[in-house]
């Protein structure tokens, strides 16, 4: 029933290209080689995704141990704090229209850097202070991540209007690669060196994303 309702209710769009599926996939590599703006957007979003995923994939394990001794429900509650990033989408879109997406991407990356780096202060605080810091940091870097993503989409959509879906596919592929790498790296460094190593990894990924956004040209 859901499928039937979608079939009848969703709008119909004419395809913007007559390429067959194999040619569409091959064209992704062509778009990557052709457009430096696409490479910068994909690389910076993918780098930031490493820290984003490293944090969320290790948070529950960290909260389960000392000094918090919290269950998985507490980690799930942190997701509500992270959901605040969804509020950044319309704001980032409006700012990108008014100030330009380049400025918003840099601000988003800088916000993520500050939010990740702030977690290094946790050992100086008591347990409740550490939890407050974690919540504030989660809200901050999620706002930065979502703001960068919306602005990157604005950038890539303006590159070649007839290939927007394919440009978006390249952007999200880079982001998902970063998330997969962040999950693996986060688990590795947490097991070897603990939570502060995850903080260093996340901060480094955000700094790298900011450096890419500060680069000119290619």
Give each language-model segment a name.
Residues 7-44:
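Juxtamembrane intracellular "pre-TM" segments in multi-pass secondary transporters
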Residues 87-101, 190:
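Helix-to-loop junctions at the C-terminal end of transmembrane segments
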Residues 65-84, 133, 166-170:
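Loop-to-transmembrane helix entry
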Residues 1-16, 212-216:
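C-terminal membrane-cytosol helix-exit motif in multi-pass small-molecule transporters
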Residues 102-152:
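C-terminal transmembrane helical hairpin of 12-TM major facilitator-type secondary transporters
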Residues 158-195, 201-205:
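A late C-terminal transmembrane helix in Major Facilitator Superfamily
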Residues 34-55, 135-143:
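Pair of pore-lining "gating" transmembrane helices in MFS-fold secondary transporters
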Residues 49-68, 74:
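Helix-loop boundary and gating motifs at the non-cytosolic
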């Amino acid at each position: 029933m859901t499928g039937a309702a979608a079939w009848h209710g969703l709008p119909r769009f004419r395809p913007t290209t007559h390429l067959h599926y194999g040619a569409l996939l091959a064209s992704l590599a062509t778009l990557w080689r052709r457009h430096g703006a696409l490479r910068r957007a994909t690389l910076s979003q993918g780098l930031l995704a490493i820290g984003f995923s490293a944090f969320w994939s290790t948070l529950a394990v960290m909260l389960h141990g000392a000094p918090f001794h919290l269950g998985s429900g507490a980690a799930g509650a942190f997701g509500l704090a992270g959901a605040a990033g969804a509020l950044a989408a319309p704001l980032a879109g409006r700012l990108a229209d008014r100030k330009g997406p380049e400025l918003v991407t840099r601000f988003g990356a800088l916000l993520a850097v500050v939010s990740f780096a702030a977690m290094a202060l946790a050992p100086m605080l008591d347990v409740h202070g550490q939890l407050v810091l974690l919540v504030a940091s989660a809200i901050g870097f999620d706002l930065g991540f979502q703001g960068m993503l919306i602005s990157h989409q604005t950038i890539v959509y303006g590159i070649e209007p007839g290939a927007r879906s394919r440009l978006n596919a390249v952007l999200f592929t880079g982001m998902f690669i970063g998330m997969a790498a962040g999950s693996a790296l986060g688990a590795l460094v947490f097991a070897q060196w603990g939570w502060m190593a995850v903080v260093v990894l996340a901060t480094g990924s955000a700094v790298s994303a900011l450096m890419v956004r500060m680069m000119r040209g290619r």
